[in-house]
Amino acid sequence: MNLATRRRVRRTSRLVAKRALLLCILLYCTSFGFTQVLFEDVDVLQRLALRAELGSRAVPAGVISLRSGVILTTRARVTTPTRSLFPPELFWNCTIILSVRSHRLNSAFLFSVLSGNRIQLGLEISPGKLTLHAGPGNAATFLYNLHDGRWHHLAFVINGRSVTLHSPCSESDSGVTQELPVLPERLNPRGTFRLGGSSALLPGVVPFEGAVCQFDVVPSAQAQQNICSAIRRQCRENDTYRPAPPALLPLPSRHAPPLLAHTLPPNRTFTFTPTNFLLAPVNGAGGSSSVRMSDGVRPKPSSTTPPPLALMQTGIDAPLSLSLVTHKPSLRTPKPTASKPGVWLTPTKPARPKPTPGKASPKLNVSKSFGPKPTARLAASKLGSKAIGPKPTPLKPSKPVKKPTSVPKPNPTKNASIGPRPTNSNKKQNAILKPLPAPKPTVPKRPSPTNKKPLQPKNKSHTTPLTPKSTLAPNSTSKKPLPTLKSTSFTTAAPNKPPKTLETPKVNPDKSKTPVPYSTPRTPRFSIQSVTLPAFDDFQSFEVEPTRFSLLVGAPGLKGDQGESGLPGPPGKPGQPGMRGPRGPPGPHGKPGRPGPTGLKGKKGDPGLSPGKAPKGDKGDVGLPGPVGLVGVEGRKGQKGHPGPPGLPGEPGEQGPVGEAGAKGYPGRQGLPGPIGPVGPKGARGFIGIPGLFGLPGADGERGSPGPPGKRGKMGRPGFPGDFGERGPPGLDGEPGVIGAPGPPGVLGLIGDMGPAGTVGVPGLNGLKGVPGNMGESGLKGDKGDVGLPGEQGEIGFQGDKGVQGLPGLPGPRGKPGPQGKTGEIGPSGLPGPPGPEGFPGDIGKPGLNGPEGPKGKPGARGLPGPRGAAGREGDEGPLGPPGPFGLEGQMGSKGFPGALGLEGVKGEQGVTGKAGPMGERGLVGFIGPGGEAGLAGEKGDRGEMGLPGPPGEKGSTGHPGTPGEGGPPGPPGSPGSPGSRGPIGIRGPKGRRGPRGPDGVPGEIGTEGKKGPDGPPGKIGFPGHAGKIGESGEVGPKGFPGIQGPSGATGDKGIAGEPGPSGPPGTLGPQGNPGPKGPAGKVGDSGLPGEPGEKGSIGLAGNAGAAGLIGARGEPGLEGEAGPAGPDGTKGEKGDMGTEGEQGVRGDPGIKGKDGPPGDPGLTGVRGPEGKSGKSGERGKPGLKGAKGNIGHLGETGSVGKIGPIGTTGPKGSRGTIGHAGAPGRMGLQGDPGISGYEGHKGPQGPIGPPGPKGAKGEQGDDGKVEGPTGAPGLRGPVGKRGDRGEPGDPGYVGQQGVDGLRGKPGAPGLPGDPGPRGTQGPKGSKGEQGQKGKQGQQGERGSRGSPGVVGLPGPRGTVGREGREGFPGTDGLAGKDGSRGTPGDQGDDGEFGLPGKPGAPGKVGVIGLPGPQGSFGPKGERGLPGHPGPSGKRGFKGGMGLPGPQGDRGSKGQPGDIGEPGFPGMLGMFGPKGPPGDFGPKGIQGPKGPQGNMGRGGLAGPVGVIGPIGNPGSRGDTGNKGELGVQGPRGAPGPRGPPGLPGPPGIPLAMNQDFGLGVVQPVFRETHTQKIEGRGLLDMPMLDQAPEILRTLDYLSSLVHSLKNPLGTRDHPARLCRDLHDCRDTLYDGTYWIDPNLGCSSDSIEVMCNFSSGGRTCLRPITTAKLEFSVGRVQMNFLHLLSAGAEQRITIHCLNVTIWSHAPNQPPSQNAVQFHSWIGEVLEPDVLEDTCWQLNGRWQHADFLFRVLDPALLPVVRISNLPKVMPSSRFHLEVGPVCFL
């Protein structure tokens, strides 16, 4: 080998050694960086995959994911193993950083770490305090009020036993330190971490409801000086657009605790200025960046660049300190100034931008995403990881990092970002911004000049330029011109209502009046609130079910225009592969890292010294990395490492060949939404979608101007049958109808009374042997047996030796009480004896008598605003207020009443008969017209010819089940029938009710003590399986042809006997037993414990009138209450003063003498038209020619009823007429008598949202809401009130002026009777007229014919309770009486009987004008008076009543959508409107829950004919079969011959009765007598008026049953499933005893429980007795109760006397002889020992309290206690079992 070769080899070997050394250094630094990353901060929300940026996983139920955090609702259940969040090295030396806001005032756990059923770490948020739990009984409490609706940034610094609470970013934050009582134990890695939810099972703990923006755990307690920089930027900016506190939270307190010094008073605003940071480019290229923080100094950017590993060369602690110092790289953000108001972005339809040339300006821009475009990657630090997402991976120092060229996909989410619009003129493609799963901090470039003008929205209203200092959202850049927002609000041209705007604190440092409204966004629109800050992503679009804090729900907006699809970006470069981590919670997926080279085996160390002798060595310096060793033996598989940081995104490889189809993989996670594709072709009509959630009611628009009358519409479809009214009075007896076909079986009737004893039947055949029944439940312990008879006396034994003195005997049984001895003399008082042992707790005594009323307590603190109370009684009419200012000109009034009849026109000439027109084409089938009125009895027609037999009709549908008929008379006893064939074995009867509890049995012998089994070996941890590849989705195959009908199967074998059926109906009441002998008098018992609250007592006598209270604040609107029952009839008013006597009037026509009635008060006379004179009979004219068919005339005015004309002669038979058109609907008639109130109708679907009204003028700034405003102006006239009491007689009216004699009109043609119109409102009181002149003598009128007797009217409804009278004047003071002797307090007397009515009092002053009385009966018709002179114009009257409907006008053109109106005040509850037309069929509802098992169904329809089988062998002769059922109804027969006309029918149904039934006017289609029976006529064709009451009764029962299921009452007949259901349905219930039925079966097995609503609706079961572990709940009900609950707890106390129960010393583990508690499923439970004093064997009663809290409710209640101590003569114990409460 020559020299050159030798040198080359030596040089090569040196180079290889250097490279190896460099590689070792790189590997060491990389591994060191990885270890540092693994032990860095823990972002809990990111580890739980709850960040909105992590779109790869759906969030759990009850969690609403936002870009700035999450919102936890009551249904949130987020759990994960502890080891997946916190590494094992994390001990009690860390900092917990939180940014939360509470939505509900309660005591809740934000998070908890559980080990089994013990809590190891948890934060409890209570009103006014925060409690950090570090184990059972180990907690630190801080006075801090978090329930004020604001965002709070907190930091808990835990250092051993010391816990310090900091409120970062405040000037006065010095921290409050508390000491834990005990050093907390290490976290169990096998424990469970829970976020939100009622997981801690502590008393009074409910799920946390609120928002969490940040939840980080930093493993260092020395980081409190940099906590403010650790708060996320978007969390700190949450304060700048915080919404108003919800209605569920109180206003912020004026007296905040000292720790809240940094918070602001309610009337101040909170502005935030982010800290400025220096962003220095690296290598001058801007490809990567290094971020540092300066304290208050803003250095200029420099071009110097540290090496890539500069952050790692400072030592071990450098990355940790950097993680705390350089958390929040941010852009320079300007402070909000007073001159630049905030931005209000409301939902809008994005306008299409128009690009125009021009310059870019840093105006406020809006894009559809917030996401940053990564332009740099940081080196070996966690810069921005808290603000954006996952941690960055340390870079290798061998290569400088270049700017990634990959362009992210467009983000379909429609959010908004604000910032400048930097452009790059070198690139032709515009990138669309989108947040990556792991975005990194970037440095935005300055906007460069370009040739494109910023895009502007079309709407230019309310344009106000924003500050030019606004920049992009931090960590984001943009390369596409974005639309510039130049307005403070987006307006919309779509006719939808925007969401209601809530008041928020104003954000203006100079107290300018610029409100910053808060909008409630809904998908898919975007809505943003901000105050000139660059990023606002607090609320993202989402759908929320209606909750108490529905702050984020608004009305749905319009669909936006289709966005342009983005261009695909170039492929990215290959990323750095990350290390393979353990299978943790789903996070950002990184690629597995390459395995590193195995190191050399180290040298053998020196032998160690024995323990205790070796001195503790100092910590050595970090050694240099050794040389690379040889490859060692393959080691064992190591434990799972911590999850590694995600690797850089790799460059997609080339398209590989298509592989074979793999096995079907698990369903993948939900992928990120792809880019918006081009607009596709119009698809086919889809199915009706699932109904969406009802939106909040929009603001009431202003009343529009009345439109022009529309054209007459077409006849609508027949409406659905209306709601059934109440049962009306019995009608007249109808004629017997045709006997119809037997109806279907009716509704199962109620259990009838026991009938008379029937005849003894023929004894049946002996039955087969029954199937052996199931094993019955073990019976209760029997009573102690009676003492046996004494045995025969044995022989007398020999006398034994004197024995040794025995031990003291056991105390003998207590003897019977002897006879009462004579009272002895009082002896000397003895010395006080020693205190005796503690007695047993006595049984619960009977409720004691109510104690005397205690002294009046001090006024309590003002409580939270309660729910809206029920509507109070109508107050007295207030005094007449001062005249208000003249109002604006009113709108055009409604159409007035029809005018008087015009003069009769001149009779026209007789027309010429027209020619018969050609036969028209057949018209369309018309709608079924409304039933016409009953016509007059027609004349008898000729007998028609026999018609051809019609074809057989189709089979009719099964009719409705008939109502059960009344029981007929008992029939004669039938002859004994032949013995029938043996019937099938009946179903086993239902299980009977549980019998009463038997007496206590004899105590059993103590069993032998069981041995504790050995602990089993721990199982091995399995290896995680490889995830299968996701196969390509196959194409959808063509739809197959329907298969051929298979042959019918053979008859199955006889099934085995079923399980016992449900419990049967209660048996009949047995005969009353003879009274037992009187027992001996018992001893007087001890005074019992205070009883449970008794039932509500009867209403006491009315108290004295109290002093007038102050005017209360206006209450919140309450829920709509149910209609109350009609009140009793008011007392009759006193007779009013006599009016002034008028002049004698003209003698009227003699009327028909009526019955002498009582003198009634004058009622309001209704409006009635004049009655015309009877005209002279004209001569009979010649019969005219037949005229052409005329058009349907207009509806005539209602004329007076004419006299009954003479019976005409029989006319010729007319030809069969065609079906006439439906008549026009009659006018609205007078209001009828009020009908009986109907049943409560079902709630109809919510109507569509109306078009927006015109925009109202912007209101002025309102006054402070706390200051009581002035008395409002008198409101508008309300709707017509209920019928009031009869008013007092009014003042006599003024005499009218003399009128001019009018001509008497001719009688008008009788018009069609119109429907009764609505009752008009009472007009204003007229002015008093002057005395009129005496009228002329009228002509003598003709005597009218006697009218037919009217139908007896229905009884009117019960009147409402009259108003309360005014308070009388105080009487004169009487003389002072003498002091009487003090009497002994008597017992409370019974309620006295109602006294006799007192004497009428002195007449009071003239009261206010009463409500209008009921409409009086029509008086005798008077003559028409003379028209008076027109009086002076009166004042502007109130708004008139609703006029008659005018003719329908032409359809107007569609108006422009109005502007958004201001929300009006809530209106008064209106009268029930007329029933609306039936709505369209709604979409198919969501599938409901599985219902209970139904009754045995009827036989199904016959199946298809099967294949003809082979001929079978002839069977044996069978028994005689039972009588077959009634066959199917045959085809409808041909119509029979026309019969003679029937007799006149009974009178029609009164109008009130028709309204009561709600069926409209029921008109009989035709009448027939009992002689006219048409064969084949079905039952359904008959009028069902006689069946309507029964149908109504059935519907009422079903309606009440459904209502009780939806709204349980908690009674025995209407039980709830759980107490939680009662708590959710009714907010006003109190703790007490209620009935529940967890399986929702028959209410007979419902159980009585205690409901604790104050702690969230707990269901508590009490044992039968407190001394035994027995509960009167069946296993089935208990299983359902377990399934419906989320946890349970129970408390058991063991009272002990000289016996050890748990441990032998305080605070010691349980001894081997400790008692064991067995759960409901047999497992041994470990209790929480609250107190144990049984180790004290001092001859006194002690006790041990055990508490069981479990997450699995199936473990409780405790059913058995084993290993109880043996009872000795000097030791005793007994149990006190508490109730078990289910959550």
Curated annotation (Swiss-Prot):
Location(s), subcellular: Secreted, Extracellular space, Extracellular matrix
Residues in the signal sequence: 1-35
Domain named Fibrillar collagen NC1: residues: 1589-1783
Binding site for Ca(2+): 1637, 1639, 1642, 1645
Primary location: secreted
Residue ranges with Polar residues bias: 462-494
GO molecular function, one term: metal ion binding
Domain Laminin G-like: 73-235
Name of this chain's protein: Collagen alpha-1(XXVII) chain A
Provenance organism: Danio rerio
Gene designation: col27a1a
